[in-house]
Amino acid sequence: MPQPPFTAAIFDMDGLLIDSERATLRAWTGAALALGVVLRESDYLQVVGKAAQDSHAILQAHLGGVAPFEQAMVAVRAALEEGEGKELLFPLKPGAAALLAHLQAAGIPCAVASSSRTDEIAQRLARVGVLPHFAAVAGGNEVLRGKPDPALYLLAAQRLGVAPAQCLAFEDSHNGACAALAAGMGLVVVPDLLQPAPEVEQACLAVLGSLEDALPQVPLWFGAP
């Protein structure tokens, strides 16, 4: 794995920058229950960090086919839209704003590499006030193969104009971590719903409890004050 100092940072979004996975999990389990299907948390965790197409195939299998999946998808979108209308459904994770502001002040370019669509990325990050910190965005709708394939991370690095080996990726999921490693980047894991697998933990630079723990490491990782 590449070693510091790095010259750019690339972030996953869901479960890392914003606390979205829990609300989405609740929406899916509720929609499944309305169809008479018990979708366990362990079932939902199979889709975390995966590309939309792969996630949909897994959920279809759990829900009993395309038709019930599509019915559940409508209910999930309605529940999330209703929730976002009432409150900030996907708040920033602790430490995210401070870390991004510090990197920007230090002249370290940042990008997002997320399985979500680019319009969702822009909307959610703008809502929590951190979109201006990012010089580039790469969304799941822009690549043929999603995480754990490295395409998203490679696209983000290309848009920053930085070699992959000069990028430090921040991830929360197994599939995202594997994508960053396959892209040849340094990796920091901040687990959300799942702890990293042993092989990921061995390959990454650090496993942190929160992005708050990343801020003191900026001088070491980026050679920046």
Predicted regions and their residues:
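Metal-dependent phosphoesterase signature
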Residues: I58-A98, A106
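Helix-loop "lid/cap" segments that line or gate small-molecule binding pockets
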Residues: A31-A32, A51-V66, R124, A156-A157
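Active-site neighborhood of HAD-like aspartate-dependent phosphohydrolases
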Residues: P2-Q46
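Short, surface-exposed acidic
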Residues: V37-L45, G65-V74, P164
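Conserved SAM-binding loop
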Residues: L17, L92, C110, R145, ...
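Asp-based, Mg2+/Mn2+-dependent phosphohydrolase catalytic module
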Residues: P2-T7, A101-Q104, R117-P225
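Short beta->alpha linker loops
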Residues: A23, V47-A51, P91-G95, S116, ...
